[in-house]
From Swiss-Prot:
Coiled coil: none annotated. HAMAP family: Arg_deiminase. The keyword Aminoacyl-tRNA synthetase does not apply. This is Arginine deiminase.
Length: 410
């Protein structure tokens, strides 16, 4: 294997992808804590698992190697000291010592096998799991209506966000919301210690210790030389600028970063919830991200006179900016919901724009977004529909649920 990570486009034939099968963390959602854990509803676990399995099998049927985050994480933690270090960091970042002694919870977690340990950390630790005899501090014995010592991580099935493959390296991301911060720790340990990746010295273009947030749903690889990044509710302009400088100074293939400002709201959480690439010259778009005349704030970042300087060019037309950076004379923006004010809002809420391209002109979408799917087919796109009644409750689509590890070049 020359490069364990290789992604130079959004549409190159998908060869290897990272998923996370929804687990106990979904059943640990309750109405009182939905907002805190970034959910709007509670999926039904048996059905969301069936739907996710269908999604994974759909990818396998097209020749894609499917890896699972939970399996890789367990395989990475073979060393005893490494396990302890990982648990220490999870507990510290999860602020678990507020209601229980760090050592008490650490000993409980380390009593499990690697596979069970990862599932337990992802699923959360309820207070009633720790025996009363183990609680030796007054604050551990206090009645508290909050049910968890360690919060569940229900957003983990959206593997796109904690890390993003960029060329032969990746970003391991500082997540904006506290509920998701721990998620990228799994990828840090997988890249450093899993035998599939550890021996290759994979470049980390931006790591999770950088103080400003960036999330993978905002990172789109347009081609070998150009990436687009959303300036969104979850990704800051400062992180984009730092990533651009790192890329320009540490490698020579990516020459342009397109920063695309989108409205900062939950419905438009990441760039890929409102804009995705489906073919060489075709993109989906949610019309509501554009102004009355199609105006937007777009900035083309290029290398400046030195490593800490950028050349920044402002553009106001997404269509023209894409033509410029991709070297195209024409391209097509396909509106989510056909541009109908009701259908576009409804289907965007259920991730009608969040397509996963598995080859040029071939995409995986949710079956429920029939207006958008019909329009994609009318534009010559092969649309592979997957089940979505429960998966869509997390406000993420096929692109959100997948982290491409390897794609063929286009």
């Amino acid at each position: 294997m020359k490069h364990p990570i290789h992604v130079t486009s959004e549409i190159g034939e998908l060869q290897t992808v990272l998923l996370k099968r929804p687990g106990k963390e979904v059943e640990n959602l309750t109405p009182d804590y939905l907002q805190q854990l970034l959910f709007d509803d509670i999926p039904y676990l048996p059905i969301i698992q069936k739907e996710h399995d269908y999604f994974a099998q759909t990818l396998r049927n097209r020749g894609v190697e499917v890896l699972y985050l939970e399996k890789l994480a367990a395989e990475a933690l073979v060393d005893k000291k490494l396990r302890e270090e990982f648990v220490d960091r999870i507990l510290k970042e999860g602020q678990a010592d507020v209601n229980v002694a760090h050592q008490t919870l650490k000993e409980y977690l380390l009593s499990f096998s690697n596979e069970e340990l990862i599932q337990k950390i992802m699923g959360g630790v309820r207070k009633n799991e720790i025996e009363t005899s183990k609680k030796t501090h007054l604050y551990e014995l206090m009645e508290d209506h909050y049910p968890f010592y360690l919060d569940p991580m229900p957003n983990l099935y959206f593997t796109r966000d904690p890390a993003a493959s960029v060329g032969d390296g990746l970003t391991i991301n500082k997540m904006r919301e506290p509920a998701r911060r721990r998620e990228s720790l799994f990828m840090e340990y997988i890249i450093k210690y899993h035998p599939r990746f550890a021996k290759h010295n994979v470049p980390i273009w931006l790591d999770r210790d950088y103080k400003f947030p960036i999330e993978g749903g905002d990172e789109l690889i347009l081609n070998e030389e150009t990436i687009a990044i959303g300036v969104s509710a979850r990704t800051s302009a400062k992180a984009i600028e730092r990533l651009a400088k790192n890329l320009f100074s540490r490698q020579n293939k990516i020459k342009k970063v397109l920063a695309i400002e989108i409205p900062k709201c939950r419905a438009f959480m990441h760039l890929d919830t409102v804009f995705t690439m489906v073919d060489y010259d075709k993109f989906t778009i949610h019309p509501a991200i554009q102004g009355p005349k199609g105006n937007m704030n777009i900035y083309i970042l290029e290398k400046g006179s030195d490593e800490e300087t950028l050349k920044i060019t402002h553009r106001t037309s997404l269509m023209e900016a894409l033509k410029e950076v991709l070297g195209l004379s024409e391209l097509v923006l396909i509106p989510c919901g056909g541009g109908d004010v009701i259908a576009s809002a409804r289907e965007q809420w259920n991730d009608g724009s969040n397509t996963l391209a598995i080859a040029p002109g071939v995409v995986v979408t949710y079956d429920r977004n029939y207006v958008s799917n019909t329009l994609l087919r009318e534009h010559g796109i092969e649309v592979i529909e997957v089940l979505s009644s429960e998966l869509s409750r997390g406000r993420g689509g096929p692109r959100c649920m997948s982290m491409p590890i390897v794609r063929k070049d286009i």
